[in-house]
């Protein structure tokens, strides 16, 4: 009877080891996904800020070009 329990016990231990391994992998994947989502939000925010600054600069350039074209002084 003991010889029959040994393989069963080994299978149970192996099953638990596999489950723990799967849990570690799953947890790591979740952490990576959380990081990537956070990184995405951060990049989008920074790009939006940069876009606003570029738009402001483009408007200033257009204004200055218009004044130069009309021959006005910039002061």
Swiss-Prot record:
The keyword Cytoplasm applies. GO terms for cellular component: cytoskeleton; SCAR complex. Residues 41-72 form a coiled coil. GO terms for molecular function: protein-containing complex binding. The keyword Coiled coil applies. Keywords: Coiled coil, Cytoplasm, Cytoskeleton. It is found in: Cytoplasm, Cytoskeleton. InterPro entries: BRICK1. GO terms for biological process: actin filament organization; cell motility; regulation of actin polymerization or depolymerization. Its main location: cytoplasm. Belongs to the BRK1 family. Involved in regulation of actin and microtubule organization. Part of a WAVE complex that activates the Arp2/3 complex. This is Probable protein BRICK1-B.
């Amino acid at each position: 009877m003991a010889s029959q329990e040994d393989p069963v016990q080994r299978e149970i231990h192996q099953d638990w080891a596999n489950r723990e391994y799967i849990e570690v992998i799953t947890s790591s994947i979740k952490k990576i996904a959380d990081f990537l989502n956070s990184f995405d939000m951060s990049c989008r925010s920074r790009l939006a800020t940069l876009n606003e600054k570029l738009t402001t600069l483009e408007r200033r350039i257009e204004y200055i070009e218009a004044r130069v074209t009309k021959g006005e002084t910039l002061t």
